[in-house]
Amino acid sequence: MRNIIILACTECKQKNYTTTKNKRTMQGRFEIKKYCRFCRSHKLHRETK
């Protein structure tokens, strides 16, 4: 089962992206480097609660 998650920038805490995640195969918090339009650069985005 895939769940919808929200990705937030670790620098400015803005919620920029949504994606899906399979909870069976991916344990823990999802992290990926993506572009943050508020910081105007590529930053680490982490799954929020």
From Swiss-Prot:
GO terms for molecular function: structural constituent of ribosome. GO terms for biological process: translation. Keywords: Ribonucleoprotein, Ribosomal protein. GO terms for cellular component: cytoplasm; ribonucleoprotein complex; ribosome. The keyword Protein transport does not apply. Pfam families: Ribosomal_L33. It comes from the Bacteria. InterPro entries: Ribosomal_bL33, Ribosomal_bL33_CS, Ribosomal_bL33_sf, Ribosomal_zn-bd. NCBIfam families: PRK00504.1 (NF001764), PRK00595.1 (NF001860), rpmG_bact (TIGR01023). Belongs to the bacterial ribosomal protein bL33 family. This is Large ribosomal subunit protein bL33. The gene is rpmG.
